[in-house]
Design a protein with these regions (language model features):
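Short loop/turn motifs at secondary-structure junctions and domain boundaries
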Residues: 16-19
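Active-site-proximal loop/helix of nucleotide/amide-processing enzymes and allied scaffolds
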Residues: 6-9, 13, 27-31, 41-122
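Long, charged amphipathic helices and adjacent flexible linkers at domain junctions
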Residues: 1-5
């Protein structure tokens, strides 16, 4: 997958109409080729809790060079929450420390998406 739109198009059919928040990671090899998708958290209508270790452990086990965080907002509102902003910062920082590059965090809502990279937040 070469862009955030590619991730959106892959994950959107699974996430856009759900009634609860789901957080996934897309794992990438050193050439940024898609390795695997893993669901790391299932939440409620308006919250989904995720800790950096839930992202990094699978990334390490699968020998991923990089990862993308993909989540849905069941409300359809693409505005990142304070929790979204904080976890993005923590994951980016943790990834740099252990050599797992965070390439983006996208939020899917309805038929659209928000990219932290495209909005200059990562």
């Amino acid at each position: 997958m070469k862009s955030s739109r590619d991730f959106f198009e892959y994950f959107s059919p699974f996430l856009k109409n759900l009634k609860k928040g789901i957080v996934n990671i897309g794992l990438l090899d050193p050439k940024f080729q898609f390795i695997k998708q893993i669901t790391v958290s299932e939440g409620s209508l308006n919250a989904s809790i995720v800790h950096p270790r839930e992202i990094m452990i699978p990334a390490i086990k699968e020998s991923a060079a990089a990862f993308e965080l993909i989540q849905n907002h069941p409300s359809g509102d693409l505005t990142p929450s304070q929790q979204d902003l904080e976890i993005t910062h923590r994951l980016s920082k943790t990834g740099k420390i252990i050599g797992k590059n965070m390439v983006d965090h996208i939020i899917i809502g309805g038929n659209s998406f928000f990219s932290f990279v495209e909005e200059g937040l990562l």
